[in-house]
A protein has these predicted regions:
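Helical scaffold of the NTase/Pol beta-like nucleotidyltransferase catalytic core
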Residues: 195-198, 227-254
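Catalytic or ion-translocation cores adjacent to nucleophile or general acid/base/metal-coordination motifs
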Residues: 237, 246-269, 275-334
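Active-site microenvironments that recognize anionic phosphate/pyrophosphate groups
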Residues: 1-224, 228-231, 303-306, 320-323, ...
Length: 442
């Protein structure tokens, strides 16, 4: 018996149960896998299937396959596993049609289907994500959330800034967010994406699509991406697009990272938004001051650690009118007494991090005022985490952290473990420093 032929049959049982593999497609898919794994004929023996049908994720079967391939000396096993899960998954057009049909029947159900599919086909690696460290800090009026994400690599602000100017040798796909990643085989410095599935949509007349984040910072963490590879931008059109999105998918919030380094996200060279089901702490913030309240609109400033202007109305057009005015005023606003300078020459420093939500028939737009100025004392950003805190995190403070969920780098779990050992033992601290030199930053 060929071990791989048995594993193929197990994977087919899993796909029938969890990935909507149709009986008509079973023979076809079996032959694709036999060819992919260089196996001449299928397994004909008895097969225990009950435990496979009860699996919620494919990790057990993928571990079997990983070990079998390793024993045969196969290279690039992880890329091959993604390819196989892509073969077992429904085609992108089938997924799109089902998501849209379910959404039309019950808002949120289509996005639930896509989210669960992406867990079951291992695009979202739930077991790995469940290992992330999470804790919540309650305050008198609100709370903050903190997670150590063990999957996402740590980046420096200088590296993020280079994305806008760097030339790359391979230009397909142009970046990790491009729609051309759909089904892409991957390479040494670019992940395989055969198992990703997306939902196309239109925002303000432009072609966009929704996919889920493989890092899943929070429940149903989605990325909404422009079909065109164009730089991040914040403009009047941004506010309209965000509000149009929550009109189509009212169970989700959606927000945009700002378009400037330090106060933006880690990908500046492709326009995208982020959203999901999870209600982040900023949504629970109360008004600090109400500027305007009538039958059409309410405008207030929140009691929050960033300056957040919240605009609420039943009309998208009304919100956009006020949001445009806030944006236009903020990007030229100066107050040197608190180090706010909007421009240095032609270089703009001020921008907005906008977040939209729909509550019943009321639209809400939260506008976080941002400024990325630096000076001699704070070369990494006046309004960024200062140097004395970079041992915790030095990356830019993006949309999600500005909303109250702080995503810390994976090294912290390891480093804190060593520090705990140091504090609870009589071992020489210098021995730890010699073995783990990155502890010196603490």
């Amino acid at each position: 018996m060929n071990e791989l032929s048995l594993i193929i049959e197990k994977l087919l049982v899993y796909a029938k149960e969890h990935l909507d593999l149709d009986a008509l497609d079973l023979i076809y898919t079996r032959n694709l896998l036999l060819n992919k794994l260089n196996v001449d004929e299928p397994y004909y023996g008895e097969l225990e299937t009950d435990y496979i049908k009860e699996l919620s994720v494919p990790d057990l079967l993928l571990d079997e396959l990983r070990n079998a391939l390793s024993n045969k000396g196969v290279e690039n096993i992880e890329l091959l596993l993604v390819d196989i899960m892509g073969i077992l998954s429904p085609m992108p057009s089938v997924v799109r049609d089902r998501v849209l049909r379910l959404e039309s029947e019950k808002p949120g159900s289509g996005l639930d289907y896509l989210f669960n599919l992406q867990i079951k086909n291992n695009y979202i690696q739930k077991i790995a994500i469940d290992r992330n460290v999470y804790f919540k800090k309650e305050f008198e009026d609100n709370f903050l959330e903190i997670t150590i994400n063990l999957s996402k690599p740590e980046k420096k602000n200088d590296d993020i800034k280079k994305l806008l100017t760097d030339k790359v040798l391979l230009t397909y796909p142009k970046c990790l967010l491009c729609i051309e990643n759909l089904g892409y085989k991957g390479r040494s410095n670019h992940p395989a994406r055969e198992n990703i599935r997306i939902v196309p949509l239109k925002l303000d007349g432009e072609e966009w699509f929704l996919q889920y984040s493989p890092y899943a910072y929070f429940d149903h963490h989605a990325i909404i991406i422009n079909n065109s590879h164009t730089n991040m931008t914040i403009s009047h059109q941004t506010f309209k697009k965000l509000l149009e999105f929550v009109n189509v998918f009212p169970t989700f919030f959606v927000g945009s990272n700002s378009d400037l380094p330090i106060v933006g996200g880690s990908i500046l060279n492709h326009e995208h938004y982020q959203g999901g089901l999870h209600l982040l702490p900023v949504f629970y913030s109360k008004d600090r001051k109400v500027f305007l309240k009538n039958d059409d609109v309410k405008v207030s400033v929140l009691n929050w650690y960033n300056t957040v202007i919240r605009i609420e109305s039943k009309s998208i057009e009304t919100i956009c009118k006020y949001a445009d005015r806030v944006f236009d005023e903020w990007i030229v606003y100066n107050d040197e007494s608190v180090d706010i300078i909007s421009h240095t020459g032609s270089t703009r420093h001020s921008t907005i991090t906008p977040i939209a939500r729909k509550i019943g028939d009321v639209y809400q737009l939260n506008m976080i005022l941002r400024n990325n100025r630096t000076n001699a004392e704070h070369p990494d950003g006046i309004f960024h985490a200062h140097k004395e805190y970079h041992h915790i995190k030095q990356e830019g403070i993006g949309l999600i952290e500005a909303m109250g969920l702080f995503i810390l780098p994976p090294r912290l779990k390891r480093q804190m473990g060593y520090i705990e050992e140091i504090l609870s033992s009589d071992d020489d601290v210098e021995n730890y420093y010699s073995m783990y030199q990155d502890l010196l930053i603490h």
